């Protein structure tokens, strides 16, 4: 009986020591820029704004500059269109049928993504891109676009 009790105590201590450790935090030394093009009333955009942006801000803090572009705002339409077209022109093989849809996210110097199926996967992709690792498989509504001078290359 004592032996079983001893094994149980060791098991509980092992689980409490190793099972509850925090994930090692990534350390960033550079500042990255994420351009976020969205549409008002777009459910996927609203989900990303509500759930994705806070994850990115928590992970990167001051190391991620997020520039938000409301593609429905008539007052800034010229500025938004110029920024959007500049990105589109830097993409290899952009599908013109995707023009104007959101959310459209561009990690400057790395890659662009249209649509976000899962905000956690998107965050993992940002981290992977910056580390020079392979991106996750695109989700059901995700389209990856590769920049001519981007650090992420199509596999």
What kind of feature is each model-predicted range?
Residues 3-10:
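Sec-dependent signal peptide recognition
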Residues 16-19:
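C-terminal motif of bacterial Sec signal peptides marking the signal peptidase cleavage site
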Residues 21-23:
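Bacterial signal peptide processing site
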Residues 26-42:
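Short active-site neighborhood of thiol/selenol oxidoreductases, capturing the structured segment around
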Residues 40-47, 104:
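C-type cytochrome heme c attachment motif
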Residues 45-59:
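Typically the conserved alpha-helix immediately C-terminal to a functionally engaged Cys/Sec
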Residues 61-81:
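Thiol-based oxidoreductase modules, predominantly thioredoxin-like and allied folds used
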Residues 99-144:
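Non-catalytic, surface beta->alpha helical segment in thiol-disulfide oxidoreductase systems
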